Amino acid sequence: KEYGAKEIKRPDNIAHDESTSEEALIHAINEIERDNGKIDLVVFLQGTSPLRSSEDIDKAIALFINNQLDSLFSACDLKDLMVWKNIEDNLTSINYDYENRKRRQDMQKQYGENGSIYIFKPKVIKQNMNRLGGKIGIYIMNEWKIHEIDTKEDIGICEYFMNKKELVKNK
């Protein structure tokens, strides 16, 4: 509150374990626009993906504006990971053809959403019930910024990186 932040309480129908971020975002957008008029963009920073700097946020916003995007997400280079899924004990490769396996160096670049920064126009989420849509852009972050907090162990990993000032500075 000291810096102008305002709490927006979710109504009970979107304040349970199965509620989506999109529901909460649409509610918040509607509340803000009701009180302050139309807004141009939303910058959504997930608390469970804390490895970002103010410079990351500024650069992502500039990329969004300069490229006239409708939505943008932050991501990290997956460094040629070969990903599989297991459905009912049936393994299937997701991002490459294992029967025609290429060298990792010859694979196309792939990125993983890191959940750290999302920027979008309010109309995108209102029309699609999704924070991504229209002309989508990507803001690439350092690989170590892919960590999320989902477990107690993740807290320690993120704290490690957050305390490494030589890594965080200008990255």
Predicted features by range, described:
Residues 2, 18-23, 41, 47-136, ...:
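Conserved core of the sugar-phosphate nucleotidyltransferase
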Residues 46, 119, 148-152:
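Alpha-helical architecture
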Residues 26-29, 33, 61, 65, ...:
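A structural alpha-helix within SAM-dependent methyltransferase catalytic domains
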Residues 30-35, 66, 127, 131, ...:
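Secondary-structure boundary motif
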Residues 138-140, 145-171:
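Hydrophobic helical membrane-anchoring modules
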Residues 1-38:
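Conserved N-terminal catalytic core of the sugar/cofactor nucleotidyltransferase
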